[in-house]
A protein has these predicted regions:
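N-terminal secretory signal peptides that target proteins for export/translocation
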Residues: 1-5
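Proteolytic maturation boundary segments
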Residues: 26-70, 256-341, 345, 404-408, ...
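Generic recognition of stable, solvent-exposed alpha-helical segments in well-folded globular domains
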Residues: 99, 115, 119, 156-160, ...
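Scaffold signal of the M16-like zinc-metallopeptidase fold and its non-catalytic homologs
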Residues: 32-42, 110-115, 133, 137, ...
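Bacterial N-terminal signal peptides
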Residues: 9-20
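Structured mid-domain segments that build the active-site/substrate or prosthetic-cofactor binding neighborhood
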Residues: 305, 312-315, 321-400
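Active-site-adjacent, His/Asp/Glu-enriched structural segments that form or flank metal-binding
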Residues: 76-77, 86-101, 106-199, 225-228, ...
Length: 534
């Protein structure tokens, strides 16, 4: 099942019809702007949610608008993690800034007012802090995150870490000569990523999202924009997006929260407030897009066919009711995918693997997809089997035994999480904090999650989870069909569409319902006799 808003972006991108496309493109090339933060707006998502926040987190906001999240944790003991999330990524770039959010990430390690160029890496090494590609920073569509893993929990190292983050926040020098020296590194990184996976992604974008803004704002940028980047260009993006109200600092580790909070205030209170950047355009989007076919070939690609349809995005804030609904959908998709997995593991399996699910694309649209991976030349066999299985599930529903299996697996997962609540790693808490910052997902305790599951589980029926999936999934009629692999399918696009039509026409039948699952070992034979107890 696909659920993550951001995880789907690389796989599925959208487009609009020509009239809307013209309007949206005109809008997206308007000058970048900022807006004043609304002081009356909620600071955190849990302020407007009935989902109870984990009170072991400490949440705060400085007068300049910067927010912070602190959590004391001793797993592993004597260590800590520090993260600084800037709430703008490559989507915030203008046309001539493409790739500069990532370029700016590089410049964070090339000199600031308090740490001269070349000294930051030495400082990291002296303090035993890890340094390397993707170790200290990461740039995405919607954010840039700076990362430091502290191997000790002394106050000096905490101060050093916060100093590095504070310098990055507003004190970078972005000197022209330093920009020129780093250009080769950035271009080399882009070349290194320009392999078959990148080509496959770009073809997918061109098929699903011609002209969509986020299809044209890959974080790695373009050769032309990177070669032409100047210190002035980079500084313009820096000053527009690195502002207190657009920043969340997270510290999780073996420190007293009072110490961390005081250190944050001491370092960041002087950061001058500024308007937050406006939300960037992510579309244009046409959720009626259908009936098109794409074939992408590369010697390095395994054979795979994806059938997709779009639907409208739904605003579903994090509430108890919405979590209940999401659980029902999760179980329903889990049953469908369990059936597909059983086919993949069977004798003379029709495909290597298949998955069915629905997820969000930013706040722009939703996409339902059935993806089938097959041995070379076996795509038609795989498509027929997978489409038939999904149609059967969506037409006739699920059995009690299938529901019980999903509930049992989920119960075990929730129980194990609750049992291990006191030994959760720093990373688990950091991920929860960043999910609140990025997706307004309220961090909760494992004990509460288990209690909520036990509350709703008795109310779930095969009919309920079936209807949840039927209402959530976009019908795969006239889907967008994308083929990728080493060898073109015989008959090309017409054969793909004909095979899909034939698969949709296959007869289907309701599965046998053998009732609730029962323990498989009910007869243990006659009791034995104790012959020795020594």
């Amino acid at each position: 099942m696909m659920t993550s808003t951001r995880a789907l972006v690389a796989g599925f991108l959208l487009a609009l019809s020509s009239p809307a496309l013209t309007t949206a493109l005109a809008a997206q090339e308007a000058p970048a702007t900022t807006v004043a933060a609304d002081p009356a707006a909620p600071v955190w998502a849990f302020e407007e949610s009935d989902v109870p926040v984990d009170e072991s987190f400490i949440f705060g906001r400085l007068d300049n608008g910067m927010r912070y999240i602190i959590r004391r944790n001793a797993t592993p003991e004597g260590t800590a993690l520090v993260r600084m999330r800037i709430g703008s990524g490559s989507l915030a770039e203008t046309e001539d800034e493409r790739g500069l959010a990532h370029y700016l990430e590089h410049m964070a390690f090339n000199g600031s007012k308090g740490i001269p160029e070349g000294e930051m890496v030495k400082l990291l090494e002296r303090e035993g802090l890890a340094f390397g590609a993707d170790t200290n920073a990461s740039t995405g569509f919607e954010s840039i995150t700076y990362m430091l893993n502290l191997p000790r929990n002394d106050s000096t190292l905490l101060d050093t870490a916060l100093t590095l983050m504070r310098e990055t926040a507003s004190e970078l020098t972005i000197a022209p000569d330093a920009v020129d020296r780093e250009r080769g590194v950035v271009l080399a990184e882009r070349r290194d990523r320009a392999g078959f996976q990148q080509r496959n992604f770009e073809d997918n974008v061109a098929f699903l999202a011609p002209g969509a803004r986020y299809a044209e704002r890959l974080p790695i940028g373009t050769i032309a924009s990177l070669e032409g980047a100047t210190a002035q260009h980079i500084r313009g993006l820096y000053e527009r997006t690195y502002v207190p109200a657009n920043t969340v600092l997270v510290v999780v580790g073996d420190y007293p929260v009072e110490q961390v909070e005081a250190a944050i205030r001491a370092r960041f209170a002087s950061w001058t407030p500024a308007p937050v950047p406006t939300e960037p355009v992510t579309g244009p989007i046409d959720i009626t897009r259908k009936g098109l076919t794409d074939i992408h070939l590369d010697p390095a690609l395994a054979e795979e066919v994806t059938l997709s349809r779009f639907s409208a995005w739904r605003d579903e804030p994090d509430t108890v009711a919405n979590r209940d609904a999401a659980l029902a959908r999760r179980i329903g998709y889990g049953i469908v995918n369990r059936r597909l997995a059983r086919l993949a593991r069977g004798e003379d399996a029709p495909f290597r693997g298949a998955s069915f699910g629905t997820g969000e694309l930013f706040e722009a649209a939703r996409i339902t997809s059935l993806t089938i991976s097959s041995a070379d030349g076996e795509w038609e066999k795989g498509m027929r089997a997978a489409v038939r299985e999904v149609n059967e599930a969506l037409t006739h529903g699920f059995t009690r035994a299938e529901l019980d299996e999903q509930l049992a697996n989920l119960r075990t997962a929730f129980e194990n999480a609750a049992k291990g609540a006191e030994t959760r790693s720093h990373g688990a808490f950091v991920n929860a904090a960043l999910a609140l910052a990025s997706d307004d997902r309220v961090p909760t305790t494992p004990e509460w999650q288990l209690a909520q599951f036990e509350r709703i589980a008795p109310e779930l029926t095969p009919e309920a989870v079936w209807q949840a999936v039927r209402e959530d999934a976009a019908p795969l009629a006239e889907p967008l069909i994308r083929f990728e692999g080493r060898t073109a399918p015989a008959g090309g696009a017409e054969a793909l569409r004909s095979a899909f039509a034939a698969a949709m026409a296959l007869p289907i039948a309701a599965p046998a319902d053998n009732g609730p699952l029962a323990f498989g070992y009910g007869d243990f034979g006659s009791p034995g006799e104790v012959v020795s107890d020594t």
